C-alpha cells in the first residue's frame, strides 16, 4: 500500500494511512490493560515498532528484531523513531555527553541494525533489562507472556500517561550528526541517497533544528516522524528501493 500510494503521489492519503498507523500504535501503548508482545523469528520494521510500544516483551531466543526501514529508503514511521528518542532521553543524565548516547540510536536506525537473537535485542535497546524476559523454549513462550500480563494486572496496572517531557537536543547535536554523515559520504561508505536518509533520521532524532535542548511531547515527535517518512516516499531512489525489495526480497544499494 505504501509503495502504491507513493508511486501515485497520493501524499494526502499516505499521510492519512500513516496517521492511522501511528494512532493505532499509541492506542496500544496507552491501553487501559497491560499489553505484552511475544515475538519470534523475523520481527522487523513495523513488527519491531509494535513491540516497542508494549508494556513488556517476551521474545523467543531466536528472534531477529530491528528497525530496518533505511534499507528500503525510508525511516521508521509507526512510532519507532519516537520510542527510540524517548528511550534515549530517559538515559540522559546530568553531566553526560548526551549526543554520544543519541549517536548510538542514530547508528542503529541509520544502519538498520538487527539483533540476531532474543538476547542481543537488549544491547540495541529493543528490549529492556529487568522488564522483558527472553525464553529458550518456544513451547512456553505464550504461557510466560500471558503470565507476565496477568502479573502486571495483579500488581495494579494503570493506564500510562502520555509523555510531554522527552528531551531532544536540537540543532547543536543535529550539526554534529550531519558532520558524521558527511564524513561517511566523503569516504564513499554511503551513497548520496543513504546520506539523505541519514540526515532525515538525524533531524527527527534531534527533534528538528530547535535552537536549544527542549522537552517535547510524543505527538510532536510523531508529526516529525510522519513528515520525514512521507518526504522520503517522494524520492525516486526510495521508490526504486521499495520496488526492488518487493520484487527480489533483498535491499538495493543506490
Question: Where are the language model's segments positioned?
Answer:
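Phosphate/diphosphate-binding loops
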Residues: 12-35, 42-48, 88, 96-103
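Glycine- (often His-adjacent) and acidic-residue-rich active-site loop
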Residues: 1-20, 73
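Glycine-rich beta-to-alpha active-site loop
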Residues: 26-72
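Intrinsically disordered, low-complexity segments enriched in small/flexible residues
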Residues: 86-117, 123, 128-254
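Active-site-adjacent scaffolding segments
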Residues: 30, 38, 61, 71, ...
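Gly/Pro- and small hydrophobic-enriched strand-loop and loop-to-helix capping segments
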Residues: 55-77, 125-141
Amino acid at each position: 500500500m505504501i509503495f502504491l500510494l507513493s508511486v501515485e503521489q497520493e501524499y494526502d492519503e499516505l499521510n492519512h494511512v500513516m496517521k492511522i498507523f501511528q494512532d493505532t500504535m499509541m492506542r496500544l501503548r496507552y491501553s487501559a490493560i497491560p499489553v505484552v508482545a511475544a515475538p519470534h523469528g523475523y520481527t522487523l520494521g513495523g513488527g519491531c515498532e509494535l513491540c516497542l510500544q508494549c508494556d513488556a516483551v517476551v521474545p523467543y531466543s531466536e528472534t531477529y528484531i530491528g528497525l530496518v526501514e533505511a534499507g528500503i529508503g525510508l525511516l521508521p514511521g509507526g512510532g519507532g523513531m519516537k520510542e527510540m528518542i524517548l528511550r534515549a532521553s530517559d538515559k540522559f543524565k546530568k553531566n553526560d555527553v548526551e549526543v554520544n548516547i543519541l549517536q548510538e540510536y542514530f547508528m542503529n536506525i541509520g544502519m538498520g541494525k538487527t539483533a540476531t537473537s532474543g538476547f542481543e535485542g537488549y544491547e540495541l535497546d529493543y528490549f529492556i533489562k529487568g522488564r522483558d524476559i527472553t525464553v529458550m523454549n518456544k513451547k512456553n513462550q505464550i504461557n510466560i507472556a500471558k503470565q507476565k500480563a496477568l502479573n502486571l494486572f495483579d500488581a495494579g496496572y494503570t493506564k500510562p500517561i502520555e509523555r510531554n517531557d522527552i528531551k531532544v537536543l536540537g540543532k547543536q547535536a543535529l550539526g554534529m550528526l550531519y558532520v558524521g554523515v558527511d564524513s561517511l559520504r566523503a569516504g564513499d561508505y554511503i551513497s548520496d541517497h543513504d546520506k539523505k536518509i541519514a540526515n532525515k533520521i538525524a533531524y527527527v532524532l534531534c527533534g528538528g533544528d530547535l535552537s536549544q535542548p527542549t522537552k517535547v511531547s510524543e505527538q510532536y515527535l510523531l508529526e516529525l516522524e510522519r513528515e520525514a517518512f512521507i518526504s522520503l516516499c517522494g524520492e525516486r531512489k526510495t521508490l526504486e528501493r521499495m520496488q526492488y525489495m518487493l520484487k527480489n526480497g533483498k535491499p538495493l544499494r543506490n
